[in-house]
Amino acid sequence: MSSGVAARCDAKKLVRSPSGLRMVPEHRAFGSPFGLEEPQWVPDKECPRCMQCDAKFDFITRKHHCRRCGKCFCDRCCSQKVPLRRMCFVDPVRQCADCALVSHREAEFYDKQLKVLVSGATFLVTFGDSEKPETMVCRLSNNQRCLILDGDSHHEIEIAHVCTVQILTEGFTPGAGSTRATGMFLQYTVPGAEAAAQLRLMAGEDASGSKRQAAAWLAAMHKATKLLYESRDQ
């Protein structure tokens, strides 16, 4: 992709919605696959009372809409202003207690795990039915739209085309707290192909530092997968 085309794909614009200022892509198709659309606000006439504590709205008890779920709350139940990066808000926005908790948890992904994904890690990568793995660095592109694999060959997989992600583990019973991520199985569609393609990433057995980096990358990818599925289910 030429630098000019890439710049147009990554271009953003500042828009004002009823919820606040948002920095969104010029073209919707080039948005982050982890993003969420703004919710439809519950109409004022349909919520005469707070949807949390049931307080009746009047001149003193004012009505507020949560910017994440769109429901109506009183000030006491919707007083927190929290960053909401999945909807591209420039400033922290008003959210109800439940939504604020979710947004706080997502902030860790954007502040820490996203940086791990973009930095990348080294894996042994096997494409399709090949029996020979290739040592490659796998990372998330800066615009969050592609997985980039670099080694003797170069591959880019659009996140939007990923259909299955399975984190591979080793250890004792899953959920017992003693397993560790060792790899990832990925299925994705290829434009023009009937069947889905697949690849397997496995952490190498070389330097311990490289293994730790790979484990951190896999943990971050596990969180990213959850956000990806949430965005698709919206």
UniProtKB/Swiss-Prot annotation:
Tell me which GO cellular component terms the UniProt record holds: endosome; focal adhesion
The segments labelled PH-like in the record are: 107-234
SMART domains xrefs? FYVE
Zinc finger annotations (FYVE-type) as residue ranges: 44-104
Q: Which InterPro entries match?
A: FYVE-type_Zinc_Finger, ZFYVE21_C, ZFYVE21_C_sf, Znf_FYVE, Znf_FYVE-rel, Znf_FYVE_PHD, Znf_RING/FYVE/PHD
Where's it mainly located?
other
| UniProt key word Transmembrane | no
Q: Zinc: is it a keyword of this entry?
A: yes
Binding site residues for Zn(2+) 2: 66, 69, 96, 99
GO MF annotations for this entry?
Answer: zinc ion binding
* PROSITE patterns according to UniProt: ZF_FYVE
This protein's UniProt keywords: Cell junction, Cytoplasmic vesicle, Endosome, Metal-binding, Zinc, Zinc-finger
Domain notes from UniProt = The FYVE-type zinc finger mediates interaction with PTK2/FAK1, and also interaction with PI(3)P and association with endosomes.
Its quaternary organisation is:
Interacts with PTK2/FAK1.
As for what it does, the entry says: Plays a role in cell adhesion, and thereby in cell motility which requires repeated formation and disassembly of focal adhesions. Regulates microtubule-induced PTK2/FAK1 dephosphorylation, an event important for focal adhesion disassembly, as well as integrin beta-1/ITGB1 cell surface expression.
Protein name stated in the entry: Zinc finger FYVE domain-containing protein 21
